[in-house]
């Protein structure tokens, strides 16, 4: 039969039939009769439409091939033979332009003259039986049905045959020829008997055995069988029933289900106010490193030794002064704290043996910066039960902040490549089980795309700082320990490199509960002048501490070196998660893997190699005001990683709430794009829930602005 089909039908029709069967997961080598039936149906649809046009006067005319008027409008739009997504797009566009009612099932054609969808049937049985099955399935007065048989019979809605006698005769003759050709090859009987009735997927899906018992047991009360329940669900009209049930609950409750259309959603309202400020625990794009290559000094690997060695590489120190004060802080104390660090590091160098850790003297400036003795005294509740006006002290509502451009710049920078590698190949962790070839191949490809990414540097920096701070918090609870902020990487040539970003001084850290806070002062090197974006640095006091010679296109230039100082705090649970930041690599690898899986299932083979090595292909990486941005697979890996890393660096209750609530709206919009006709109730309440998370957090505000870009393009 397969050979017959390939000889008998036009190659384009055969190819479309192959695609259709693949889309529905059917094997044409096994289902050969189905293959022949699909080709026949496609050919009838094309013949139905051939030569029929509409002229300038809106009349239907027949134009044979080679006629000079071939630029006329086609009378029929062919829907059959397109892939499902495209077919629904065509149907929706017809409904929008003509006002036709949207059909429940995909029809085969649209007739622009009669303004109606047409369902074409080709049957090997009695035409009237097949006609009734079709009518029963589509249950729509609006869709016109036209059935042809291989014996030359036909049947159409209200005996309206749409086409002229000659066009229909052409179709009948072709069907008769196909039947004769099959019969002469001994294929007809099997083909005729193989036709099943018009079935929907649900009807064909028989539930038997244990599953059937479970289905019957799990019905809602008052339903005796699955059939009863199905019939009830099929005929269910949601609005009245749900409203009725709700009105029994409370007078205030109503939930009328409103259709969710393209015009329904509005953009999220982002707050107004002063621009938002940087709130990460360490500097990101603005950080500056003092580095040593191929470290081999005594005590290499001991943080304090490494830090001192890095500090010695810089000779441009100068008398520090405040260039951007902290509005609410005592800025001279920040200045004195830095001078104290320099002085105490100098003292260490003068000692014969450098100690492994350094505890700072508890000076007044450090006590102030670390909030020593600032916490209100805790009193046992039993001792003050009788106090009349006992209350929790008032806290102000957080001030609303607007989105600032710096956070998008931070994100863009995080996606970029640096000239160093921040992870070794095995950083993502070996699999415990005997590793599959595909899994390790994917991991190696992914690692090579992200190992040089700036977001990966942030991961390693975050892991180091949080580990060091948690260790010190447990080991030296009462001390103001000096903790260098260090990272390690490899240069392009494979040489090891140790980097110093600055220092942290931790405060008292008697951390009993996971959420108990340890205060710390961070002091970080930078070449960024804070006066360019003062709003970003609201929480910092910035000092100018030296001049650095930078190699540039015009030779060496001297640039001022700044120190960004601020008081900050963290907790055991936050440090625990900070130490686990490598998980971001795993999360983004899994996202990439699901993209590869989707591609592989379409192509029916593993596409890992093609996915990473086909440099010409682009993939969507996100939405911007310009539309959907596309880029190389490497950029997609790095963008997904950066998103995951920023979710960790800027973790907050606002982000938790925004992610959970905006996801609901996202799913509704996606359902609309997939033509699933979603309905909603209390959409206003959903918007409220999303927008109450838009307060002042830079990362949440950026995500909300991306979400608005998505809404614009998804619905345009």
UniProtKB/Swiss-Prot annotation:
<keyword id="KW-1035">Host cytoplasm</keyword>
<keyword id="KW-1048">Host nucleus</keyword>
<feature type="short sequence motif" description="Nuclear localization signal 2 (NLS2)">
    <location>
        <begin position="184"/>
        <end position="247"/>
    </location>
</feature>
<keyword id="KW-0479">Metal-binding</keyword>
<keyword id="KW-1191">Eukaryotic host transcription shutoff by virus</keyword>
<dbReference type="GO" id="GO:0075526">
    <property type="term" value="P:cap snatching"/>
</dbReference>
<comment type="similarity">
    <text>Belongs to the influenza viruses PA family.</text>
</comment>
<keyword id="KW-0378">Hydrolase</keyword>
<keyword id="KW-0464">Manganese</keyword>
<keyword id="KW-1157">Cap snatching</keyword>
<dbReference type="GO" id="GO:0046872">
    <property type="term" value="F:metal ion binding"/>
</dbReference>
<feature type="binding site">
    <location>
        <position position="119"/>
    </location>
    <ligand>
        <name>Mn(2+) 1</name>
    </ligand>
</feature>
<dbReference type="GO" id="GO:0039657">
    <property type="term" value="P:symbiont-mediated suppression of host gene expression"/>
</dbReference>
<dbReference type="GO" id="GO:0039523">
    <property type="term" value="P:symbiont-mediated suppression of host mRNA transcription via inhibition of RNA polymerase II activity"/>
</dbReference>
<dbReference type="GO" id="GO:0042025">
    <property type="term" value="C:host cell nucleus"/>
</dbReference>
<protein>
    <recommendedName>
        <fullName>Polymerase acidic protein</fullName>
        <ecNumber>3.1.-.-</ecNumber>
    </recommendedName>
</protein>
<dbReference type="GO" id="GO:0004519">
    <property type="term" value="F:endonuclease activity"/>
</dbReference>
<keyword id="KW-0255">Endonuclease</keyword>
<keyword id="KW-1190">Host gene expression shutoff by virus</keyword>
<keyword id="KW-0597">Phosphoprotein</keyword>
<keyword id="KW-0540">Nuclease</keyword>
<feature type="binding site">
    <location>
        <position position="108"/>
    </location>
    <ligand>
        <name>Mn(2+) 2</name>
    </ligand>
</feature>
<dbReference type="InterPro" id="IPR037534">
    <property type="entry name" value="INFV_PA"/>
</dbReference>
<comment type="subunit">
    <text>Influenza RNA polymerase is composed of three subunits: PB1, PB2 and PA. Interacts (via C-terminus) with PB1 (via N-terminus).</text>
</comment>
<dbReference type="GO" id="GO:0030430">
    <property type="term" value="C:host cell cytoplasm"/>
</dbReference>
<dbReference type="GO" id="GO:0005576">
    <property type="term" value="C:extracellular region"/>
</dbReference>
<feature type="binding site">
    <location>
        <position position="108"/>
    </location>
    <ligand>
        <name>Mn(2+) 1</name>
    </ligand>
</feature>
<dbReference type="GO" id="GO:0006351">
    <property type="term" value="P:DNA-templated transcription"/>
</dbReference>
<keyword id="KW-0945">Host-virus interaction</keyword>
<dbReference type="GO" id="GO:0003723">
    <property type="term" value="F:RNA binding"/>
</dbReference>
<dbReference type="GO" id="GO:0075523">
    <property type="term" value="P:viral translational frameshifting"/>
</dbReference>
<keyword id="KW-1262">Eukaryotic host gene expression shutoff by virus</keyword>
<comment type="function">
    <text>Plays an essential role in viral RNA transcription and replication by forming the heterotrimeric polymerase complex together with PB1 and PB2 subunits. The complex transcribes viral mRNAs by using a unique mechanism called cap-snatching. It consists in the hijacking and cleavage of host capped pre-mRNAs. These short capped RNAs are then used as primers for viral mRNAs. The PB2 subunit is responsible for the binding of the 5' cap of cellular pre-mRNAs which are subsequently cleaved after 10-13 nucleotides by the PA subunit that carries the endonuclease activity.</text>
</comment>
<dbReference type="Pfam" id="PF00603">
    <property type="entry name" value="Flu_PA"/>
</dbReference>
<dbReference type="InterPro" id="IPR001009">
    <property type="entry name" value="PA/PA-X"/>
</dbReference>
<dbReference type="GO" id="GO:0039694">
    <property type="term" value="P:viral RNA genome replication"/>
</dbReference>
<keyword id="KW-1104">Inhibition of host RNA polymerase II by virus</keyword>
<feature type="binding site">
    <location>
        <position position="80"/>
    </location>
    <ligand>
        <name>Mn(2+) 2</name>
    </ligand>
</feature>
<feature type="binding site">
    <location>
        <position position="120"/>
    </location>
    <ligand>
        <name>Mn(2+) 1</name>
    </ligand>
</feature>
<feature type="binding site">
    <location>
        <position position="41"/>
    </location>
    <ligand>
        <name>Mn(2+) 1</name>
    </ligand>
</feature>
<dbReference type="InterPro" id="IPR038372">
    <property type="entry name" value="PA/PA-X_sf"/>
</dbReference>
<feature type="short sequence motif" description="Nuclear localization signal 1 (NLS1)">
    <location>
        <begin position="124"/>
        <end position="139"/>
    </location>
</feature>
């Amino acid at each position: 039969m397969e050979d017959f089909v390939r000889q008998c039908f036009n190659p384009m029709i055969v190819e479309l039939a192959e695609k259709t069967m693949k889309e529905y997961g059917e094997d044409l080598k096994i289902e050969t009769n189905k293959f022949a039936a699909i080709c026949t149906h496609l050919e009838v649809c094309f013949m139905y439409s051939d030569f029929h046009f509409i002229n300038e006067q809106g009349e239907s005319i027949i134009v044979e091939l080679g006629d000079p008027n071939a630029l006329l409008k086609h009378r029929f739009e062919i829907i059959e033979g397109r892939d499902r997504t495209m077919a629904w797009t065509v149907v929706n566009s017809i409904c929008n332009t003509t006002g036709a009612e949207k059909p429940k099932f995909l029809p085969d054609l649209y007739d622009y003259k009669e303004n109606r969808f047409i369902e074409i049937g080709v049957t090997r049985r009695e035409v009237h039986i097949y006609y009734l099955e079709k009518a029963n399935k589509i249950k729509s007065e609006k869709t016109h049905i036209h059935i042809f048989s291989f014996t030359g019979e036909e049947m159409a809605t209200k005996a309206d045959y749409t086409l002229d006698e000659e066009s229909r005769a052409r179709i009948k003759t072709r069907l008769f020829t196909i039947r004769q050709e099959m019969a002469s090859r001994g294929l007809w009987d099997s083909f005729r008997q193989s036709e099943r009735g018009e079935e929907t997927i649900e009807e064909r899906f028989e539930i038997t055995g244990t599953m059937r018992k479970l289905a019957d047991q799990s019905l809602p009360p008052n339903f005796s069988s699955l059939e009863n329940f199905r019939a009830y669900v099929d005929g269910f009209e949601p609005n009245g029933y749900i409203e009725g049930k709700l009105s029994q609950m409370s007078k205030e409750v109503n939930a009328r289900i409103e259709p969710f259309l393209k015009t329904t959603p509005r953009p999220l309202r982002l707050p107004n106010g002063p621009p938002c400020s940087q709130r990460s625990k360490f500097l990101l794009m603005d950080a500056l490193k003092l580095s040593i290559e191929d470290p081999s000094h005594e005590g290499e690997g001991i943080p304090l030794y490494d830090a001192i060695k890095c500090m010695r590489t810089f000779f441009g120190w100068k008398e520090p002064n405040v260039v951007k004060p902290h509005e609410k802080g005592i800025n001279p104390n920040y200045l004195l704290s830095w001078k104290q660090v320099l002085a105490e590091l100098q003292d260490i160098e003068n000692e014969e043996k450098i100690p492994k850790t350094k505890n700072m003297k508890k000076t007044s400036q450090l006590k102030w910066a670390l909030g020593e003795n600032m916490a209100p005294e805790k009193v046992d509740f039993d001792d003050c039960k009788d106090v009349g006006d006992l209350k929790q002290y008032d806290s102000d509502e957080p001030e609303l902040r607007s989105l600032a451009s710096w956070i998008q710049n931070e994100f863009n920078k995080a996606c970029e490549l640096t000239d160093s590698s921040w992870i070794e190949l095995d950083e993502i962790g070996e699999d415990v089980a005997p590793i599959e070839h595909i899994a390790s191949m994917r991991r190696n490809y992914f690692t090579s795309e992200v190992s040089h990414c700036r977001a990966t540097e942030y991961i390693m920096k975050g892991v180091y700082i949080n580990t060091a701070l948690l260790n010190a918090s447990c080991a030296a609870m009462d001390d103001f320990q000096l903790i260098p902020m260090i990272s390690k990487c490899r240069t392009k040539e494979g040489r090891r490199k140790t980097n110093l970003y600055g220092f942290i001084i931790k405060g008292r850290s008697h951390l009993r509960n996971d959420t108990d806070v340890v205060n710390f002062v961070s002091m970080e090197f930078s070449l960024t002048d804070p006066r360019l974006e003062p709003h970003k640095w609201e929480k910092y006091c910035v000092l100018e501490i030296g001049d650095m010679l930078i190699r540039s296109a015009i030779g060496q230039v001297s640039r001022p070196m700044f120190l960004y100082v601020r008081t900050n705090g963290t907790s055991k649970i936050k440090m625990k998660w900070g130490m686990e930041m490598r998980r971001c690599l795993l999360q983004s690898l899994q996202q990439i893997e699901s993209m590869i899986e989707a591609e592989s299932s379409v192509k029916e083979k593993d596409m890992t190699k093609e996915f990473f090595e086909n440099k010409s292909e682009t993939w969507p990486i996100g939405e911007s005001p310009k539309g959907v941005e596309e880029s190389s697979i490497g950029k997609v890996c790095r963008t997904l990683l950066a998103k995951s890393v920023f979710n960790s660096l800027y973790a907050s209750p606002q982000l938790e709430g925004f992610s959970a609530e905006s996801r609901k709206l996202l799913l509704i919009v996606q359902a609309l794009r997939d033509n699933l006709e979603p309905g909603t109730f209390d959409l206003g309440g959903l918007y409220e829930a999303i927008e109450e998370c838009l307060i002042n957090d830079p990362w949440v505000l950026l995500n909300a602005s991306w979400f608005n870009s998505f809404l614009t393009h998804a619905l345009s």
